[in-house]
Amino acid sequence: MKTLLLTLVVVTIVCLDLGYTRKCLNTPLPLIYKTCPIGQDKCIKMTIKKLPSKYDVIRGCTDICPKSSADVVVVCCDTNKCNK
């Protein structure tokens, strides 16, 4: 009986943990990812036009997806490491 209870507790903890964790890439190059904080359940990639041929890329976690503009292209997604 104790083994069954322990198993149920472990399964519950694992399931609860998976319920709110999102992993998003968070560097300009798509190599390193981080676990998003609670409440930020979307990944974001923002490409910012600096000069005619120069762009900055920002990746990370977000709770809302801002709109794109003429100089900023925003892509949001809701699966792990989807902001490549």
Curated annotation (Swiss-Prot):
GO terms for cellular component: extracellular region. Residues 1-21 form the signal peptide. Expressed by the venom gland. Coiled coil: none annotated. Its main location: secreted. Keywords: Cardiotoxin, Disulfide bond, G-protein coupled receptor impairing toxin, Secreted, Signal, Toxin. Disulfide bonds join 24-43, 36-61, 65-76, 77-82. The keyword Protein transport does not apply. It comes from the Eukaryota. GO terms for molecular function: toxin activity. It is found in: Secreted. It holds the Pfam family Toxin_cobra-type. CDD domains: TFP_snake_toxin. Acts as a beta-blocker by binding to beta-1 and beta-2 adrenergic receptors (ADRB1 and ADRB2). It dose-dependently decreases the heart rate (bradycardia), whereas conventional cardiotoxins increases it. At 100 mg/kg, intraperitoneal injection into mice provokes labored breathing, impaired locomotion, lack of response to external stimuli, and death (after 30 minutes). Belongs to the three-finger toxin family. Short-chain subfamily. Aminergic toxin sub-subfamily. Negative results: does not affect blood coagulation and does not show significant hemolytic activity. This is Beta-cardiotoxin CTX23.
